[in-house]
Swiss-Prot record:
It comes from the Bacteria. SUPFAM superfamilies: PH domain-like. InterPro entries: PHb (IPR012544), PHb_sf (IPR037063). The gene is yjqA. This is Uncharacterized protein YjqA.
């Protein structure tokens, strides 16, 4: 997927080596990026230890929030696919003890939601 897909809210797969380098300042020593997806400016990163959600804020994207969720804290997740009239897909992640989802991300109609679901299933099951 290209630049236009990213602007439209479609997630695209990123090079794990590039993300490893970009997030080197927050990764633990020996922690490896296993999969990464870009959604507009935000990142969904799966490492061998945790899920990292990168939320770039503001016009320039200089202000950045890094949300780290250890896999053992994820109690469940759901994926809602796009339909005929509702064109958005949605990913929700609950953490232990929470009634409401801790993470809710919307995607435009694309197939990458299935790839993200597969990675989540692999690390949480």
């Amino acid at each position: 997927m290209g630049f236009i897909d990213g602007l439209l809210g479609n997630a695209s797969t990123l090079s794990t080596a590039a993300v490893q380098e970009e997030l080197a300042h927050i990764l633990l020593e020996g922690e490896k990026v296993e999969a990464a997806f870009k959604l507009v400016r935000d990142l969904i990163v799966f490492t061998d230890k945790r899920l990292i959600l990168v939320d770039k804020q503001g016009i320039t994207g200089k202000k950045t929030e890094f949300q780290s969720i250890p896999y053992k804290s994820i109690s469940r997740f759901s994926v809602e696919t796009a339909g005929r009239f509702d064109l958005d897909s949605e990913l929700k992640i609950w953490i232990s003890g929470a009634e409401l989802p801790a993470v809710s991300k919307q995607f435009k109609k694309d197939e990458s939601i299935y790839d993200i679901q597969k990675v989540l299933a692999a690390v949480c099951m």
